[in-house]
Amino acid sequence: MRGRLPVLRSLHRVGRVAFLLATVAVLNDAAFAAQQEATAPQKTVTDKAATVKKVPQTETPTTEARKDENLLVTARRRNQMEVISGGQLGALGTKKGLDVPFNIRSYTSSLILNQQSQTLGEVLENDPSVRTTYGYGNFSEIFVIRGFPVYGDDVAINGLYGITPRQLLSPQLYDQVQVLNGASAFLNGAAPSGTAIGGNINLMFKHAQNTPITRLTGDYASQGVGGGSLDVGRRFGQDKAYGLRLNVAGLDGQTSIDHERRHSVALGADFDWHDDKTRISLDMNYQNQGVNGGRPGVFLGTDITGVPRVPNASHNYGQRWTYNDLNYIFGMLNIEHDLSKHVTLYGAFGGLGSDEKGNYSTLTVNNSQTGAATAGAMYVPYAQTNESTRGGVRAHFDTGPVKHEINAGGSALWEESRTAYSMALSSFDTNLYNTAAVPAPTENWTGGNLDNPLPTSRTQLYSLFFSDTMSFWKGRVALTAGFRYQNMLINGYDAYTDGSRTSHYSEDAITPVVGLVVHPTRRTSIYFNRIEGLSQGLTASGTNLVNLGQIFPPFKSVQYEIGAKYDTGRFTTTLAFYQISQPNSYTEPYGNNGSFIFRENGLQRNRGAELSVNGQILPGLRFNGGATLIDADLRRTAQGLDNGHTAIGIPNYTINGNLEYDLPFLRGATLVGRVENTGKQWVNTANTAHLPVWTRFDLGARYTFAVAHKPLTLRFGVDNIANTRYWASAFNGYLLQGLPRTFKFSFTTDL
């Protein structure tokens, strides 16, 4: 396939072979360990007694049954759907949700395993405040939180930006997927791509726990995607100070969309060490993902006034020669050291190297009745080299009746992006409903070096932060105040000709934060925050501009939020009300001589309410989900033409509900169900066409039982059980179709 280097094909094959070898090795190791345990002499109480020959004791059926039951109880508890209130809050560290003035929750690795999630977007289908769409013209996942996007470049790992695979992400390497609703410039700094204004996603690597684990999983999804994973964790040394966690996962095959194939390989090695004062972890990872013949998003021609009907749920209107192949090597080092019981120093350093290639084709519908469309072809290689770091100090002390937690530190990110392209000069005819296979067009219009792309941008982000969280009245009231100084240095280059620098941006900003938490009772809290989002300002560009080249300071988005939380440990609920105002830009006529002016006077104001409920409602009955309402209002638009209209692709409401029910008459059996409901979405800023409301139902079951004194869990599920055809998203002005009915099966056993 064009653009896929032989070395990358070799890496992919090596990853698959490594998976098989690791599986065989661990199975052999487990069998050997079991044999050694069975033949090893039993320990005695005294040295004298050691000379007495011990007679092996055979366990009675009752004892074996009791052991099996204990294993099953543990396995069933581990399989339960769990969403944790709280998570890692950047500058503030890891906190319980009840104690912070922000709305944050964490989806665990057990949930990821039980739902057979293969991408980050599939994990976030559980969240009522998140909707997923594709990137512009490709198959990357973009997440929409509170009406604003989070690009893959702006997803963090353990609070570090710039080290995450940016298009598609394999979730099997992570212990938690954490979602923060709301702006986060103080907490995490400015995101490198300028998104994450309405929310932030943070991933936490798996590390070895005190209980050893050797977990083997096999997966299947229709129409023919097969895969599996191996998760091994051990602690060793004195006081179990050393830990090692190894993860291998992969899949390959045709999805439930006609002629679409996906493949992935993920390898992770996580090492950690600790003593009484110091904690060190090192995480190293490789990931490959790819899509062949993927179903793309759908653009609408300028003359289209209505939304075309939705094609058959499994119909693929893409071309089979399209593909992407994404390779990433990434990792990080974390260090914490307690100077005393009141003062902790910490630091982290991470890096990413990526090599992406793809041949893309996105169709544009020109007749919504017949589905007549045109499409083009473009090959794009893209590479990144990123480095990211942070460091700081966290201190606790008292001043009279007031307890203080001081957080101070800084962060830095260096990012270089390189790209090129080749494209077909003319488009070809196609159809949304009756799509014929078309030979790949000749792509003879080239920009840049396809084999060794030149830099298109170099980004340097530096920041310093300080905050003080003051607690009063035995912790019943906590007030957080702080700020982050952010500097942005961004250079643009002509990657398509001589590589010369074409733009220079160097600006800074200070973003404050104020947060208040009041605990009326031990299990409840009321909170408020005022925090900002931050993104690069623009430089005036265009034709006949009177302010051509004017550089604008960074965009500051302002959020106000108030809410309430209830947390019993097994059950949590959060109710939040918020407003986020984000500036934007436009060009409008200036005078009567054909001149224009570039302004940053526009505004998008998103107001909304969020309700989330997680945990055990009744014994054996668990629920995770909630609902959101949002009003995404456009204000101060160019010449006032769209004032009061709703922003494109933001539904007026969303509902998600996940339910688990343990069958009382069959121990170990659990029924699972999920519903997703998404409200009306406008397709254009004129608000003349919109997507209808859509609803999707998923059903499934799992059963845990013992085989040879080992727990085995079988799972079966059906996503979109009614095979509903629907347009899932209109974000950014293009349509994304929902997935067809998909059957899933998996097994997991602890060896």
Task: State each model region's role.
Residues 384, 403-415, 453-582, 606, ...:
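Structural signature of Gram-negative outer-membrane beta-barrels, strongest in the C-terminal barrel
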Residues 172-175, 185-269, 273-279, 329, ...:
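Outer-membrane beta-barrel translocator/receptor signature
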Residues 290-302, 414-418, 513, 517-561, ...:
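Surface-exposed extracellular loop regions of Gram-negative outer-membrane beta-barrel proteins
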Residues 6, 406, 528, 560, ...:
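Conserved C-terminal beta-signal and adjacent last beta-strands/turns
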Residues 64-211, 562, 732:
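Acidic, small-polar-rich N-terminal luminal/periplasmic segments of exported/outer-membrane proteins
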Residues 251-255, 268-338, 351-384, 427-453, ...:
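Acidic/polar loop-and-plug regions of large Gram-negative outer-membrane beta-barrel proteins
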